[in-house]
């Protein structure tokens, strides 16, 4: 007979209690929060019935002001009003000042070169600013859902690297939130769209937000969302449209540069309003700083056309990575407020040969997808068969002898993932090994991005090649990497979580992929040369060590001279640039030293058998 557990009222959790979870779209321009209520996912609104929260924080007073109230202060208090903070996450101060020279903020560098914003309220870093936005969204969710959140899913651009993802998680922690998962924005859109439509096949998600662009090629099949390939630009978005239009207006007005922070913000606000108006009308009358004139949609489209073309280049690369032709794409899902721009819809439609889907609110679809995923991860849908397969955007590898890159996890590998590979020592008696973690598609370390270094110490002294070091790369569901190196005979190990000090610039991401294709032939030639040089070094060092140990006993003077000549010839070839010549030199040296190697083997066997009888062998 089964025993029933009985608890005092209120002392145990109800087995079917619905946990409060929310999805947060932490956007560059606007942020949203969504949740599943009564089986339906929807965005949660503020007291005024607004879903969108401008991602703007004002620090002019003792308390942070977030959202629409902060936006209203952006012109009068530009240095204390932080806008588009997402662009600053995970970047160095040098990178920010180079890329965004006209930002009105007062910056200083932290000890490790990261940006600190100096405000009337005090110093703030991008993580703290992001946390203040998250706090407002969390409060909205808790008021709407009637209690404390058990966890949240926060969306990030697919191209966010480790530093930017870690910064997002740190901001959530600072806001007092438990992160169930970080979710790629295009994948979140696919969740919302896939569940609504029940479609199966290949779908392209074109996500153009305020500050980032992402393209994802996904395969939807029986509840499985598989990301075939991703691409994009971590610093291209609707904000750039605004800046181009603001610069155009400044020229029309005849303003001298550099502009004051106040004038710059005024121009940007007018540019944003004008851009939005072009979605409904062909021309807009603009009045600014005493200048009055008409700006046409055609003028605006000519300004932004090169940027839209740039997004289509990323689309082309993503299709190639996914091994999919444009005509195989069943639907194109438009995500992000910037996809309301008519030229964007027109050019994307021409590229894919079909009219993009715009029936889902492009501002809300990411948050809704995150809300659905949060509901599942919170345990509210235990019978859910939805499986999410994200991928890593750039290969992760390790440096080996000769400056070569050995790829451990190739790009577009589904995450979470763990891969291991064994390595060995290069020199006799080596007791430590340096592990250099790199990111990129090229064959040589100098052409890839360095992520981190750490050392494994305590390797037992052995002959070169005898030690076995197992290196494991593990990428979690949030795209964060941890690396472990372990010497197998002793179990000694060292571990690091990769959290670089700043993120990739927008051009670096695209260039890393482009260069891997442009220089593919040269890279393979460079790799072949480096591999032969490493092998030559091994042969040279091994032969010199053997001659020092047994040369006087086992070799005549003439034989010594022959081997030394072979070594000198190989050194000369090794310092050249012909891989085939080095390979032949290695073969010649091996052939010249074969008799010496046989004598050393005989000597070792005699020494091992000395003093033993037939019976004991």
Curated annotation (Swiss-Prot):
UniProt keywords (A-Z) are:
ATP-binding, Chaperone, Nucleotide-binding
Signal peptide as annotated in the record: none
Kindly give the InterPro entries that the UniProt entry links to this protein.
ATPase_NBD, Heat_shock_70_CS, HscA_NBD, HSP70_C_sf, HSP70_peptide-bd_sf, Hsp_70_fam, ISC_FeS_clus_asmbl_HscA
What does the record give under GO molecular function? ATP binding; ATP hydrolysis activity; ATP-dependent protein folding chaperone; unfolded protein binding
The GO biological-process annotations, alphabetized, read as: iron-sulfur cluster assembly
Region annotation Disordered: where it falls in the sequence: 1-23
**The family this protein is said to belong to:** Belongs to the heat shock protein 70 family.
UniProt function note: Chaperone involved in the maturation of iron-sulfur cluster-containing proteins. Has a low intrinsic ATPase activity which is markedly stimulated by HscB.
Q: What is this protein called?
A: Chaperone protein HscA homolog
Biological source species: Vibrio vulnificus (strain YJ016)
Annotated gene: hscA
